[in-house]
């Protein structure tokens, strides 16, 4: 079965999923359904027990310190570009990408060392990808960024285009989780997860809903202010 974030170290994968989990549950401790989904992502990424515990802690800790730990690890990883791209994708999912939501994502990008030009290009990548609505295999193809007309711009800005599309949870997550759920069902393991859910009852749609404003992504600003000392 295809693995999530397969080309990255255990520490990087744990930091990436930990950051997503921490932001998604910024104003509350993760529910049982949310935790089941988050742990399914950890399973699909083949995380070690140590990193699974770290991701779980990030989903239940509300001070923002676990998020800071995750971001500090990602500062030196190409996954930082994938993380910001995913956050923009999640924020735009409900077509209500507010100025406050954008400002919160920009805080994360700035903390990760992503400059304004790079952020603007990642934003363009999200918009152009949404227009094409590609499948997982198409996005991972070497020619995909060229088709969007962004490959040279991304290269010149210092973004590693070979790694950008390999860490996109917003694109790869549903398909990988669907395969994971089919594997569980074949073994007779029950689960409430629906990776294609678009509502607030668990699954990728639940995470998107939380990050896009369904549960107030804009309200995560309070935690970000604590983390970044603003």
Predicted segments — roles?
Residues 1-22, 32-93, 99-230:
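Small-residue-enriched hydrophobic alpha-helices in membranes
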């Amino acid at each position: 079965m295809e693995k999530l974030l397969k080309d990255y170290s255990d520490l990087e994968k744990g930091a990436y999923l930990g950051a997503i989990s921490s932001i998604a549950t910024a104003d509350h401790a993760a529910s049982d359904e949310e935790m089941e989904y988050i742990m399914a992502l950890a399973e699909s990424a083949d995380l070690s027990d140590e990193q699974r515990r770290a991701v779980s802690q990030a989903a239940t800790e509300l001070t923002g310190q676990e998020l800071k730990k995750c971001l500090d690890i990602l500062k030196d990883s190409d996954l930082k570009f994938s993380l910001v791209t995913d956050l923009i994708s999640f924020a735009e999912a409900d077509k209500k990408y507010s100025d406050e939501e954008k400002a919160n994502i920009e805080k994360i990008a700035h903390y990760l060392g992503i400059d304004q030009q790079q952020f603007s290009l990642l934003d363009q990548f999200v918009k152009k990808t949404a227009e094409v609505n590609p499948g997982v295999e198409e996005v991972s193809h070497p020619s995909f960024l060229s088709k969007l007309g962004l490959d040279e711009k991304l290269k010149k800005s210092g973004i590693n285009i070979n790694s950008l599309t390999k860490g996109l949870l917003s694109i790869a997550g549903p398909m990988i989780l669907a395969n994971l759920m089919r594997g569980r069902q074949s073994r007779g393991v029950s689960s409430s997860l629906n990776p294609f859910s678009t509502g607030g009852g668990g699954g990728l749609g639940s995470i998107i809903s939380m990050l896009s404003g369904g549960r107030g992504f804009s309200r995560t600003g309070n935690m970000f202010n604590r983390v970044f000392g603003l």
